[in-house]
Structures are given as C-alpha cells and as structure tokens.
Design a protein with these regions (language model features):
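Bacterial N-terminal signal peptides
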Residues: 6-21
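C-terminal cap of metal-dependent C-N hydrolases
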Residues: 52, 352, 441-448, 453, ...
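Acidic, glycine-enriched loop/beta-strand segments at the rims
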Residues: 54-66, 427-434, 438-439, 487-497, ...
C-alpha cells in the first residue's frame, strides 16, 4: 500500500502526468489491486463509503468498491463489507470521486467572513486556488487602508502582512475548504510602487523579485497576473519573465488572467507562451475565452496556438467556467484611463464634468485602445448589475443598465458612473460577452480544466445579501448535469479527471485529486442522475442539488445534502514552502 503522499500522485498516475502534458488519456485497471485485502476486511476505519461507483480521477472507467478512511487519509479501497467503521456512508447508486479543485476561487477573504464556503462545498469543491493578480498578501498599511471598506463592512480584522501570517490566520479560523494561493504580481507592484501606473524600473523589479521569493518560501503556489486591469496592465513582458523565473526556482507555476480576451486575444496568448518559454515555467491561463461578438469563432486558433506550444515542450494549459456570460466589477465598464491611480483617484476624477463626458464617449467607442467591456457587451442591455455593497442600492440588483437608466431617469452610462461613485467601486456586474460553442470547444480540449472565478456565497448569513454570477453556486454541478448527463460533451470520467487530478497536477498539489490509498480524504458522493446547478442569472442564490456527501481531510462537511459543523479545511502551501518557526 502506498502511504507516502508526496509520491502517490506520480506513482498512481504514472503515465497520466505525461499524458496530461501531451493531451492524451490514460486508462487504469477497472478494479485496482489492493494489497492486504484480508487485513483491510478485519480492521476498523473512521469512515467507510460503501457500495459506490468509484470514479477515481484518472479518467479510467468507474468501478464498484468501498473506500476506507482513517483520520485524514484514504487507507483502503475494495470490498470492506466486513470492516468496522465509526461512520458508514451508503453510496449505493451514487458516484464516489475525489473532491473538486476550483482553479480560480476568490474566497481567500470570504472564508474568514463565513467559514462554511457554502456555495462551493454544495457543488463538490473541496479545494480553492486563489490570488488573481492582487493576492491577499503581502500587504502594507497603505494597501490595508485601500481594503478597509470591505473589511469594516464584514467586521474582519486584517491582522496579517505576509502570506505566512495569512496562512496562520486561516489555519486558526478554519473553514470547510482547503485554500492555496498565488502571489499576485499586481499586488507586488502596488507594494513596491504605490499607485504609480507606469513601467517599473530595474530597481523596482528587483524589489518585487525579493517579495516573490519570500512569498514562495511562505507557501505561494507560484506567480499570478491579471494583465487586463490596473495596476498589472502596466507590467511588461520582461518584468513578468523576471518575476516568473523566481517562482520557477522555488517549484512554482505562472498563472494569468491574460492581457486580452477580446480583440487582441492572439497577441495575448502569444505573450503567455513567451513568458512560459523564457521563464521555463509551467503556465496556466485562467478562464480562457474569446470575448465579444467580433471575436466569436477565434477559439479554434487560440487552442491551436497553445497546442503547438505544448507540442514543442511548453507546459501550458488553461481552465474555463461553463457559462457564456462573465462577471466583473462595475468600474471595469469604464475606460481604463479612468481607473488609473487606484479607487480614490478614480472616484475623485469621476466628479469632474469633463472627465464624465469623455468617459461616456469612450464607453461607446468600438475602436477604443482597451478592453471595452461596455461596448463589447452590447451596452446597457448587455450589462446587468449583480451585487452592491451599499444596502440602499440593492433595489437595482438583477436589473440591466437599460432598466436602471429608465428607473433613474438618466442615460445608462450616467447610471454606471453614479453607481460606481455611490458604492465606492464595490459593485459587480454580469456581462454578455461569449458564445456557447466557443465554451464547448474549449471544454472538450483534454488539457482544459475548470474554475468558478468567484468567491463563496451562501443562502443565509453575511454572504447572502448580494447576488452574484451563478458560477459561484453551480460551476462543477453544471458540468456534471448539463455537459455530461444532458449534452454528452464529456464523459463522466473525463469530467471528473479535469476537475480533480488534472487540476491538482497543474498547481503542484501532490496528495489530492485521486481516490487511492495514501491520498488525502477529500471526497464527494453524488447522484449522477440528479446532480445539477439550479442557480440562474436572475436568481443565482441557490445551492446545487444532488451532492449528497462531501468530505474534506476525512471529515464530512456535507452529510445527506446538509452542511455540517465540521471545519477541517487547511492552508495548502506550495513546493517552495520552508517552515521557519
């Protein structure tokens, strides 16, 4: 029996690691051989999941078996009908699979507000990967002041400065999910340069490299960027290569919200590939898409370019969410130049009549030299207000800006600007920018995994007040229900592989993502006939259905479809982590 978690993933998957890199599929025996079967029958487990259809995460066909768990690990798989167990879960007619890994969650703050991570665990997510561009740490007093409104609203004390201190806080607070994070290069620019929206000097890049090294030692999974937005949009390719080299030295990866998902998507993908090659680092593209109607159909060429890079040895892959609408901050509907210098500078700038007039003109400019989300979404009819921080503004949630403009008696563009000011840039919107067939084409690609690009929400409590994109509630169950069971886009085994072992490999997690002895006991039990998302754009705040049991580190966080009081989630630190305590 394999007991070394660090060797388990490589030993069990064997060729899968290679095949994932090459875009192939690997089959394992229908019923894996388990040494010591007789001994397993006679022993006592903390939990036995009995009579389930095991989809083990390798992509191999399902097999019927029991799964025995002791403490936080899977100990045995096979016929355990004679074994004793403190808890026995009857999985007859159910699928037993590894817990799902969300390659872009946004819950590093949310789990401190509500430790249930309710909308995530009810869709089977047991691990969240966070840190898009601007990460939770490192921060200084000035950066903390910028985030004060949200922290004060939720009554959360920001008592960390470094990533190590954040992980310590996370471990102390505990939640239902495991959380790993990247160090955001946009946040590093803010830390070193303040609100200076310009190219970094050599000295500033050197300081950022020191911070990357520190974050990697503290447990960051690698380096991230969010190049469509301030301050990361001022990062040059050379700057990113230098920072990524440091992450690579510590065993990390580079992961990016690329510079353009729209009119310059080809050039943007080429930049990602350049960084991967020059820094010699595994690379992942977050929420791959070809946005705005003018770019629909370009997914084929985007995938071809990445596939060609993979064929010549670059370790590049991507993830998506299974929806044709995106979500963003309301301020992202404004021209980029309006947002330069940070939130305070933007809010002050928008008070000026000349600035407002120019911003409104640029919002309707089809040739604007930036990702024009307002125009690309079709303007007022294609942008829906999804959430606000100020309770007085919640009457507008779920309305398009066409409707909001009418309700306010003003130009919808003025409504956007006024709401940005009134809610201090804390509002979010849903934008109609993608085509279903492009999403499906990416989904079918073997090396594409999944993400929610959302923080955890809940039907009650402090995270229930605002609406959000339905992906926060149903990304993974939507894949299983719509795209596996109903549409047949993916087989069940392939979908689970993408959600589990492939995702784990991409971010360097070695002890999760498979149903195998020695692996951590992050497991889901769901009904393949009923599992589904029920969240919609109009009524998003609804938990998924069909997810019967969810275990994290051997503890049940969902039992018989209900959230429990267990909070076994842990910080997940990357390969470069060194414990200095």
């Amino acid at each position: 029996m394999i007991t070394c978690a660090s060797c388990t993933l490589a030993a069990v998957l064997g060729g899968l690691v290679l095949s994932a890199a090459c875009g192939g599929a690997t089959q394992s025996p229908t019923q894996p051989a388990q040494p010591g079967a007789a001994a397993a029958q006679a022993r006592t487990f903390d939990v036995v999941i009995a009579n389930g259809r095991v989809v083990d995460g390798t992509g191999a066909p399902w097999f019927r078996a029991d799964v025995g768990i002791t403490a936080d690990r899977i100990i045995a798989i096979g016929n355990l009908s004679g074994a004793r167990a403190s808890t026995r879960i009857d999985a007859t007619g159910q699928v037993v699979a590894p817990g799902f890994i969300d390659l872009l969650g946004q819950s590093e703050f949310n789990v401190l507000v509500d430790s249930r991570a309710a909308s995530k665990i009810t869709q089977g997510i047991t691990t969240e990967i966070t840190g898009e561009g601007v990460s939770i740490a490192p921060v200084d007093d000035r950066m903390m002041a910028d985030r004060k409104a949200s922290y004060d609203f939720f009554k959360i004390a920001q008592d960390w400065r470094t990533l190590d201190e954040y992980f310590a806080r996370l471990a102390k607070s505990s939640s239902t999910v495991n959380v790993g994070t990247f160090v955001g290069s946009g946040g590093l620019r803010d830390y070193v340069m303040g609100k200076e929206d310009r190219v970094a000097t050599a000295d500033e890049v050197a300081k950022m490299k020191v911070l990357v090294a520190e974050a990697m030692v503290h447990g960051a999974l690698g380096l991230s960027s969010s190049l469509q937005y301030v301050p990361n949009r001022f990062s040059t390719t050379d700057e990113l290569v230098e920072l990524a080299k440091v992450a690579a030295e510590h065993g990390g990866i580079y992961i990016t919200h690329q510079r353009s998902e729209g009119n310059r998507v080809f050039e943007s993908v080429d930049e990602v590939l350049t960084i991967a090659e020059r820094a010699d680092i595994p690379t992942e593209i977050w929420h791959l898409k070809t946005a705005y109607k003018a770019n629909w159909g370009k997914m084929t060429e985007v995938l071809r370019r990445i596939e060609a890079a993979r064929a010549r040895g670059l370790r590049v892959s991507a993830n998506i969410y299974p929806y044709d609408r995106a979500s963003n901050g309301l301020d992202a509907c404004l021209p980029v130049w309006v947002r330069e210098g940070g939130t305070d500078a933007m809010l002050k700038r928008l008070q000026e009549p000349d600035t407002r007039a120019r911003a409104k003109r640029d919002m309707d400019d089809p040739n604007a030299p930036f990702e024009n989300q307002w125009y690309g979404s079709g303007g007022a009819a294609g942008v829906m207000l999804s959430s606000v921080l100020d309770p007085a503004l919640r009457k507008y949630e779920g309305m398009t800006f066409e409707a909001i403009g009418k309700a306010m008696g003003k130009d919808p563009r003025d409504a956007v600007i006024d709401l940005v000011i009134a809610d201090k840039a804390e509002s979010s919107v849903i934008i109609s920018i993608m085509r279903e067939s492009d999403v499906v084409e990416a989904m079918r690609t073997p090396w594409v995994s999944f993400d929610t690009d959302s923080g955890a929400r809940a039907e009650d409590g402090p995270l229930s007040a605002s609406k959000s994109h339905p992906r926060a509630w149903g990304t993974f169950t939507r894949v299983l229900g719509k795209y596996v069971r109903e549409d047949g886009v993916l087989t069940l085994e392939e979908a689970v592989r993408k959600m589990t072992s492939q995702a784990a490999i991409r971010v360097g997690i070695t002890d999760r993502g498979l149903v195998r002895p020695g692996m951590m006991a992050d497991l889901v039990v769901f009904d393949p006939a009923t599992v589904a998302d029920v969240a919609t754009f109009e009524q998003p705040n609804r938990y998924s259905i069909g997810m019967r049991h969810v275990l994290v580190n051997g503890k049940s966080v969902v039992a018989n479809g209900a959230i429990t009081a267990e909070r076994p989630g842990r910080p997940l630190r990357g390969a470069g982590y060194r414990d200095s305590r």
